[in-house]
C-alpha cells in the first residue's frame, strides 16, 4: 500500500509540473530561510553551554542604587576574587579575567599581533578549553608563562613543537610557552589567542588592592551541591566588610550560560537582552515557513476540482477517509522532501554570504546524527503542516456529488483560502514596515551630531616606545605638515573605558552615586578632536604647568554637579584634587543611541594609552599615511604602525543594528517572493477555472483591461485587508523595539502608506501577468464545446 501511495504521489507531482514547481520552489525557499535562522538561533542559545561545569559557573555582578534606581554591572575590583575564595567555602574556585588590546608578539625575526587575556591560574580548571599540550594545573603557574591557542601556535611556529619556546610580548618581556589550548569555539564569550598568568599582573605591580577600581571580570565555580540561594544571601554583605567607600553596594552571582542572552537589567531586574532579537527572528522563521505552507494549502485546494473524480471513484471502490488522508499527506511529505533537498542546496550556497552578513561561522554538521534527525523531523513537520488542510478537505468530498459533476468551490473552500492569503500578506507588510523603521532608527543615530570632528582624525595605540618618544613624534608630525594637531588620551575618542561614582565636589549630596565617565587627555585635546569649548580653555602644560591637576567637564556634568560657575571648581577623584579650567559641549563617547552622560576629563601626566592625530586636509590621505608610517617607524622601529580612522571606528557602533536591518530586509524579501509565488499559482488556477466566463465576456465585447480588473480586484481586496491588520501589529512591535533606545526615531504615517502601496503594487504585478494572459486568450478555444 505504501508503495502504491508513493507511485500515485509521484505521478501527481510529474503530471502537474507547474503546480509542483511553484510548490517545491516556494516551500524550498521558505525552508531554507527558516533553516538559516534556526542555525543562527542554535548558535545564540548554545553560548557557553559546552563547559563541563556549566551549571556551576557564574559571573560576579554588582548591584547599586544610582539616582533612585538599581544599576547592575559585571565589572569588579581585583581584590574581590580573593575575598570570595576566602570567605565562602561553598565556592570551589574563582578566576579573574582582564582584557588586553592586540599586542605584538615577536618570534625570532617574525612579528604577529594577538588578542589575549590575563587570567588566574584556575581559569583552565574552571572552563572547558582542553589543552592539546601541557598540564591544566601547571600551564598557568608562573610570571612569564603563556598558553597559546592551536591556531596562533601554528601561525607562529608552523609544524614545530612550540612547548618551551620563548616569545617576546609587546617588545618588553619574554614569555615561555607552557601550553597549547584548543581554539575557543564560536559560541564562547571568551575570545582569545593567548592566556597569561595573573602572576604577571602582580609582578608588574598592577594588581591593585582598591575596591573602588572595578576593572576586571570575576568568575566563580560553586562546589557540587552548593545551594545558590544561600550563597546569594551571604554575598550581599561582601562589600560592607571590605569596601569602605561604597559599603552599600551588593554582590551577586549571575549564571554564565545566561549572560550572552539575558544580561540586560533595568532597576535591578533582569529584563532580557539579546534573547529579544533571538525570539524576534524565531517568530520570523516560523512565519516564513507557515507562509510557504500556506502556498501549498492554497494551490492544493484551488485544484481540488481536478482531483475530485479521483477521490469519488476511490471512495466508491471502498477507500476510507483515513487512507485518503494518508495518501494526500504522503504526497505533501514527498513534496516537502524534495523541497528539503532544494533547501539544503540553497543553504549551502547562501551560508558564506549569510556568515559574512551576521559575522559568524555557521555550518551544517553532516557528520552529526542529531543533524539528520532534526532535518528529517523538520521536513516531516513541514510536509504535514502544509498538507494537513488539503488532505482533510479533499478526503471529505461526497462521491455522489463529485461523480455527478456538482462540485463547485463554495464559501467552505474560498473563505479559508482568502484567510490564508490575508495571513501571508499581513506578515509580509509587517516585515516591510519593520525594515523601514529599523533603517530609519539607524539613520537617526548616524545623523546625530557627535560633538567632535571625525574627519581626518586618526588614532594609534601607544605601544613600544611611542609614549617614550611622544614629544619627538608629535613635533615631527607637525613640522612635516602631516598633522595640524596632536594629543594623547587614556582611550579613543569613540570609547569610554573608565567611569566613577566616587567623585566629590562642593555641595554634593552624600547619597548621590551618579556614574561619571572618566577620561584623561593632554595638550591640544580640544583642538585635535574638534570639540566645542563652552567656556574656559583647553589643556596647555607648556604655558600652565599646573594643568597636570586641571580638568575639563562636559555640560551634562555641570548640570549633575549643579555648578553655576564651573570654571575654578574643585573635583576630588583618584585621591587627587582637580581644578576645572573649562567646559566642553556634550559629545557622543559611547553609544549613539543613549543619552550623553556626565564626563570628567583629567589633564593627567600618566594613564595615556592612545595618540590622536588631526591630519592636514590639504594633503592627500595616502601621503599623510605614508608620512605617519615613516615617522612612527623611525621612533618605534619594532612595531607596525596600526592606525585607525575615527570615522570608520565610529561607524562600527551601528554594526548590530545594521545587521538586524539587513536580516529583516532579506527575510522580508523572501517572504514577499514566497507569497508572490503562491499568488501567481493561485491566480493561474483562478483564471483557468473562469476561462469560459472570460470567453463569454470577450464575445460580448469586454476589453483586456476589464478582464484584468475582474481577476485582480478580489486579490487587491485581500491585500487591503492584510494592510489594515498589519498596520497596528507593526506599530506595536516597532514601538516596543524603539522603546529600548532613549535616542530614537518617530514612526511616521508614510511608512505604513509606503509599505501598503508596495504590497499592493507587488501583488498587482504578480496577478496581472495571469490576468493579461487570460484576457488576451482566444474565446473560441474556451467556448468551442458549448
Please annotate each region the language model reported.
Residues 2-11, 15, 51-52, 226, ...:
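Membrane-helix entry/capping segments
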Residues 32, 36-39, 252, 333-399, ...:
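Small-residue-rich transmembrane alpha-helices
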Residues 292-334, 678-716, 770, 777-778:
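Interfacial "coupling" helices/loops that link adjacent transmembrane helices in transporter permeases
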Residues 120-133, 146-273, 472-656:
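Mid-to-C-terminal secondary-structure elements
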Residues 1-21, 268-270, 300-337, 341, ...:
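Alpha-helical transmembrane segments of integral membrane proteins
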Residues 38-102, 211-221, 232-234, 250-261, ...:
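Membrane-proximal extracellular/periplasmic loop immediately following the first transmembrane helix
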Residues 13-16, 23, 44, 60, ...:
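Generic structural signal for small/hydrophobic residues in well-ordered secondary structure
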Residues 15-42, 273-309, 337, 416-438, ...:
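Hydrophobic alpha-helical transmembrane segments of multi-pass inner-membrane transport and secretion
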